[in-house]
Amino acid sequence: MKRLLPILLCSLLLSGLRNATAQEASKTWTLQECLDYAYQNNIQVRQSRNNQLSGIEDTKQAKAALFPSLVASTTQSYTNYPSSEVTDNNSYTGTYGITAGMTIFEGGKLRTEVKRQKVQNQMDALSVEESVNDIRIAIVQAYMQCLYAADAVRINRSTAEASKAQRDRAEEMLRTGSISRVDFAQLQSQYSSDEYQIVVAGSTLDNYKLQLKQLLELDIMEEMNPAVPGVKEENVLKALPPKNEVYETALKVMPQIRRGELGIEAAKLEEKSARAGFFPSISLSASVGTGHMSNNDFESGSQIWNRFNENVGLTLNIPIFSNRKNRTAVNKAKIALNDSYLEWTSLQKELLRNMESAYLDAVSAQAQYLSAREKEKYARESYELTSEQFRVGVKNTVELITAQNEYSAAQQQVLQAKYLTLLSIELLNIYQGLPASDIY
């Protein structure tokens, strides 16, 4: 019994670990959970945060350049005199010093650099927001594709079940001679085709799950199971804000637009820094030092005191002719400033194109959804009536299969319109700086 107890404990422990692993593997992910996880773990987002931290260090360095520098130095040397005429063939020399330096004036270049680095820090923070928005768009697209594919699998399974029931009934009718073998073969072929569509839809779903899993940087052993909601119709048919209001809001909240504005400010500071090259620079230096020699008549302590020296210097540099370096720097800074204006304008136009496309997609998809839902209603009614008439011998096999395929196609059209609408609405939410919609 004593030997069995440790074995039982180990078995219970392993069983608990397996259960925990299974629960983790079977975790379902809502859209918001996917977004929250990606914001913390996606590599591109993390790299953009590292770039922001690196820029903060550059700002600290730019600020430190305003303060004096201080350097302590010492040199120890040994000299050998091989000539026999020298009494002491060896000489030891030591020097010691402390030097300080400070730039007093450089045309305001140092302070301008501090301002530019602060602007760059703001731009880096906005770049992080851009990365977050980019991964959000990618995840929303992949998630909606997963939901669409999951619903497509469900519809294909339902269609295959109906085809199987028709095939089974036709088999009985074949035994009684109510239908021909050709009609039965057509229904059998339709059932096989519907089974094949289940496999295709399942493969498509697995592919979309893999894409979503890769966006979240999940481990190979972790499974991606999106939570399939019962989408509320009011979320699909929700009223859209006016297009011009969406664009005006996007201009205020989208990080790339604000980054473009700061890019202009940074370019202006770059031009100011380049113009500083035409101004004189003044720097101050100061040092103290001493030293000693071993073959001197004085003791080392006396030498250090007697050799003690102080130095103060003021350096003035006046640029007279710099081989056009300063003029070239200013002209290139002007060109860069013009480029920054063009980049800002380009970002605004790109945002307008993307926003208008998403808005048009949302409007069109909502109209398609209403139309497809109406079509599905009558296609279902037609299919049900055709099925009843087939049972009593009024409709033939071709008419039954045609009605079934039309109903299945109508269901797929409803799905496409529904999830295209939800995707477009989510994109409009991003352009307005809104959180993800609650589609559950």
Feature annotation, model-predicted:
Residues 1-31, 440:
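Bacterial Sec-dependent N-terminal signal peptides
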Residues 20-69, 75, 220, 227-265, ...:
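Bacterial Sec-pathway N-terminal export signals of envelope proteins
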Residues 23-28, 73-102, 229-239, 272, ...:
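Small/polar, glycine/serine/threonine/aspartate-rich low-complexity segments that form flexible
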Residues 46-50, 63-64, 104-132, 186, ...:
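Sec/SRP-type N-terminal targeting helices
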Residues 50, 193-218, 376-434:
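Short segments within alpha-helical structural elements
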Residues 97-99, 143, 247, 313-315, ...:
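Membrane-embedded beta-strand positions in outer-membrane beta-barrel channels/transporters
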Residues 134-249, 361, 365, 407:
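Periplasmic alpha-helical coiled-coil/stalk elements that build and connect Gram-negative outer-membrane
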